[in-house]
Amino acid sequence: MVKLKICGNATLSDIIEFSKLDVDYLGIITDVVSQRFVKSEFLTFVKRYVEKPIVNVKVNVQISEIERELLVSDYFQIHRVLDDSELELLKSYDFRKRIILYVPASFEYKKYLERAIDTVDMVLVDSVKKGVGVDYNVVSSFLKDYPYLGVGGKISIDNISNFIDLNPAWLDISSSIEIYPGKKDINMVKKIVEVVKYGSSSNK
């Protein structure tokens, strides 16, 4: 079954509500480049209230800093393309099994996708540019070769069934379920959960 990650959570009330639903991962962005940014201390606070796996998301981070970041979260997502030296360094750490690497959904990044898969267990194929929908054709092609990828990028209630039919490892959803950046629409999240976990056309 496809797993579900709700990302960009910035309020404790949302996180507590989602922890009661059939959501597999809760993403929290601790990088100031995002309008959904929260301080790292928020992660420690959240862990007191929920047992669901927490994903700490950053764009700007040094590989040497990740081990410390993982002290307050279950997984760490690096949402940028790494250079070869960073990938090699990441391979040397035991905690790389708790790392999620971002790969832009473009055929130009096919080689990088292969290197990312060789480095970590969890890889997210997402939009090339912020605010742009993920390229369905690229995702479909990548998943034929690597069926254990996660997929994100403007996935909404209107198009989610198309992505479920591709049977990715997980779907990463954020902006399409927001009232405003960082604040989610609980009813919309419930609809997403219903489709992914119980009501998708591909599972009927």
From Swiss-Prot:
Alphabetized UniProt keyword annotations: Amino-acid biosynthesis, Aromatic amino acid biosynthesis, Isomerase, Tryptophan biosynthesis
InterPro entries recorded: Aldolase_TIM, PRAI_dom, RibuloseP-bd_barrel, TrpF_fam
EC annotation from Swiss-Prot or TrEMBL: 5.3.1.24
Reaction(s) the record says it catalyses: N-(5-phospho-beta-D-ribosyl)anthranilate = 1-(2-carboxyphenylamino)-1-deoxy-D-ribulose 5-phosphate
Enzyme class: isomerase
Pathway per the UniProt entry: Amino-acid biosynthesis; L-tryptophan biosynthesis; L-tryptophan from chorismate: step 3/5
Pfam assignment, any one: PRAI
Key word Isomerase present: yes
Molecular function GO labels: phosphoribosylanthranilate isomerase activity
A GO biological process held by the record: L-tryptophan biosynthetic process
Record flagged with keyword Isomerase: yes
Gene3D superfamilies in UniProt: Aldolase class I
Family as reported in the entry's similarity comment: Belongs to the TrpF family.
Record protein name field: N-(5'-phosphoribosyl)anthranilate isomerase
Protein species of origin: Saccharolobus solfataricus (strain ATCC 35092 / DSM 1617 / JCM 11322 / P2) (Sulfolobus solfataricus)
Gene that encodes the chain: trpF
